[in-house]
Amino acid sequence: MIPSSTRELLNIADSKYAVVVAVAKRARTLSEKYKEDENYRLSTMVTRALDEVVNGKVIIEPSKEDGSREV
């Protein structure tokens, strides 16, 4: 389920940027995994990645001191 509000996403990470980066990284991983399958599109991967972040399957680590973050 995709949340209807960005407030829900801000409960997951400390910024919208962190959520976008995490979702993009996960979508890229998924698209590489399903690269051979023509039934999957990138938009499907982004939706799936967002769903995984919202449901806690992908954890967004807090920022490090140097400003980088782990997904």
Curated annotation (Swiss-Prot):
The keyword Transcription applies. Keywords: DNA-directed RNA polymerase, Nucleotidyltransferase, Transcription, Transferase. InterPro entries: DNA-dir_RNA_pol_omega (IPR003716), Pol_omega/Rpo6/RPB6 (IPR006110), RPB6/omega-like_sf (IPR036161). SUPFAM superfamilies: RPB6/omega subunit-like (SSF63562). GO terms for cellular component: DNA-directed RNA polymerase complex. It catalyses: RNA(n) + a ribonucleoside 5'-triphosphate = RNA(n+1) + diphosphate. Its EC number is 2.7.7.6. SMART domains: RNA_pol_Rpb6. Pfam families: RNA_pol_Rpb6 (PF01192). GO terms for biological process: DNA-templated transcription. GO terms for molecular function: DNA binding; DNA-directed RNA polymerase activity. The keyword Signal does not apply. HAMAP family: RNApol_bact_RpoZ (MF_00366). Belongs to the RNA polymerase subunit omega family. The RNAP catalytic core consists of 2 alpha, 1 beta, 1 beta' and 1 omega subunit. When a sigma factor is associated with the core the holoenzyme is formed, which can initiate transcription. Promotes RNA polymerase assembly. Latches the N- and C-terminal regions of the beta' subunit thereby facilitating its interaction with the beta and alpha subunits. This is DNA-directed RNA polymerase subunit omega. It comes from Syntrophomonas wolfei subsp. wolfei (strain DSM 2245B / Goettingen).
